[in-house]
Amino acid sequence: MIQPNLSGSANGHARSYYAASAGSLPGYPSLEGQPSADVCVIGGGFTGVNTAIELARRGLSVILLEARRIGWGASGRNGGQLIRGIGHEVTGFARYVGQEGVKYLEQAGIDSVEVVRQRISEHAIDCDLRWGFCELANTPAQFAAFQAEQDSLVRLGYRHPTRLVAPQDMQQVVASSVYAGGLVDMGLSLIHISEPTRP
């Protein structure tokens, strides 16, 4: 487990557990002159870094610009959840994008986790990775939605184990009995968010 040095500086990042426990981060040169590249990616968060990697793999020359530090913005300030989805129930978007659009959003969420999983593996990134995540239901209606979510994952061919947790069993999973149930997904994780954007 990565141990924080909470008395130290935030390495040029916003103060957080992740910045305090990241150790020293390398500096990068400022842009000078008039460099030329096939593509200029602006923003060094997870999306920008991944875009630059993918383009370079396809043989394009890439310049990656970041105003502060790699991983400084939203990518360096989240809670470290490596989870599928967009923070909302995607079924609510059906009236805008139709059922095929909802299916696409669900698959995109799954694929995004797989991309990060591949990057962590191929670059041997030490990010305190621990597979297994439990979504928590505050109401019986949310727990029922988890049941529908699990069914949807099966239809999408999701390859990781999932398990519904009944309300009476939540104490065993999260040491609390206040929740109305949960959905454990072994394909999701928490990560140390400062590490995946290191060189």
What are these regions (language model features)?
Residues 57-77:
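Glycine-rich FAD pyrophosphate-binding loop
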Residues 1-39:
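Extreme N-terminal leader/targeting segments of oxidoreductases
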Residues 85-168:
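Dinucleotide-binding Rossmann-like beta1-alpha1 core, especially the glycine-rich loop
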Residues 37-64:
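N-terminal Rossmann-like FAD-binding beta1-loop-alpha1 element of flavoenzymes
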Residues 168-177:
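Flexible hinge/switch segments at interdomain interfaces of large molecular machines
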Residues 79-84:
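Short, surface-exposed loop/turn segments at secondary-structure boundaries that line and modulate
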Residues 189-198:
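Residue-level detector of conserved catalytic or cofactor/ligand-binding positions
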